[in-house]
UniProtKB/Swiss-Prot annotation:
Its cofactor is [4Fe-4S] cluster. GO terms for molecular function: 4 iron, 4 sulfur cluster binding; lipoate synthase activity; metal ion binding. This is Lipoyl synthase. NCBIfam families: lipA, PRK05481.1, PRK12928.1. It is an enzyme of class 2 (transferase). SUPFAM superfamilies: Radical SAM enzymes (SSF102114). Belongs to the radical SAM superfamily. Lipoyl synthase family. [4Fe-4S] cluster 1 binds at residues 37, 42, 48, 276. GO terms for cellular component: cytoplasm. Pathway: Protein modification; protein lipoylation via endogenous pathway; protein N(6)-(lipoyl)lysine from octanoyl-[acyl-carrier-protein]: step 2/2. Its EC number is 2.8.1.8. It comes from Rickettsia conorii (strain ATCC VR-613 / Malish 7). It holds the Pfam family Radical_SAM.
Length: 296
């Protein structure tokens, strides 16, 4: 039996040590912003921060959910910070970002799940950095009536919401969420604002079967999702769900081939693929692929 405590060579990354990495780290700290890069212990943080790419996490650093895969703190969240949108806009400007990714913790305690706060952040960035494209990675807004409309009206360039895993694992891995609610949210955003690119992702290596992954791929395409990401699940701490399997690069290539036959504008599937990994470059490719589809 394979030793799952030891990560295979294709998972290993270099430790961050560049000047730009530390400059990015200092700016984020000085502006009192949270990032999912740090909170979720992302393996790509060194590469991304060295390129001044970061995914800012709004709505605080404490989540109201307790997903078994996620390293973000869970508990009773703090009050909303009304100045966070302005500080975020300042960070985008100082880092001279061409593309910014904004995510958040789940806020089941808020009436709209934090949708209006996302909208305020988008508005502030548009004021000071009108040429910056904006990608948001949101919670599922479960039972939050009107949240999808607030997000669609805010007009992000990319709307991302991850289904995370296959439906059969939701009870143990993502107990506070509902698979079909996530699909519905993605579909509704596309119906409300067809010009917004939609994106979703999932992890593999949690014990799912390959046919279940293919079914999720089909479901996401049926929901009119444009961009699919698939990456390897990595256990953040011993208190989280264990890795059931390290999926090989060859298996990821197979999943990518399958997904591409379904009609997605873009597919990224690899061991280190994460929702926001290479997001700026991928957005440019996404637009190019869309234009090619229009003329074909």
């Amino acid at each position: 039996m394979a030793n799952l405590n030891k990560r295979p060579d294709w998972i290993k990354v270099k430790a961050p040590n560049s000047t730009e990495y530390y400059n990015t780290k200092d700016l984020i700290k000085n502006l009192r912003l949270n990032t999912v890069c740090e909170e979720a212990a992302c393996p790509n943080i060194g590469e991304c921060w060295s390129k001044k790419h970061t995914t800012v996490m709004i709505l605080g650093s404490v989540c109201t959910r307790a997903c078994r895969f996620c390293n973000v703190k869970t508990g009773r969240p703090d009050l909303l910070d009304p100045y966070e949108p302005q500080r975020l806009a300042e960070a985008v400007q100082k880092l001279n970002l061409k593309h910014v990714v904004i995510t958040s913790v789940d806020r089941d305690d808020l009436e709209d799940g934090g949708a209006s706060h996302f909208a305020e952040c988008i508005s502030e960035i548009r004021k000071s950095s009108p040429n910056t494209t904006i990608e948001i990675l949101t919670p599922d807004f479960l039972r939050k009536e009107g949240a999808a409309e607030i997000i669609a009206n805010a007009k992000p360039d990319v709307f991302n919401h991850n289904v995370e895993t296959v439906p059969s694992l939701y009870k143990t891995i993502r107990p506070g969420a509902r698979y079909y609610n996530s699909l519905s949210l993605l579909h509704n955003i596309k119906k409300l604002s067809p010009e917004i690119f939609t994106k979703s992702g999932m992890m593999v290596g949690l014990g799912e079967e390959i046919n279940e992954v293919v079914q999720v791929i089909d479901d996401l395409r049926e929901a009119k999702v444009d961009f699919l990401t698939i990456g390897q699940y990595l256990q953040p701490t011993k208190n989280h769900a264990e890795v059931a399997k390290y999926v090989t690069p060859e298996e990821f290539k197979y999943l990518e081939r399958v997904a591409k036959t379904k009609g997605f504008l873009m597919v990224s599937a690899s061991p280190l693929t994460r929702s926001s990994y290479h997001a700026d470059e991928d957005f440019q490719k996404l637009k190019e692929n869309y234009q090619q589809k229009l003329v074909s």
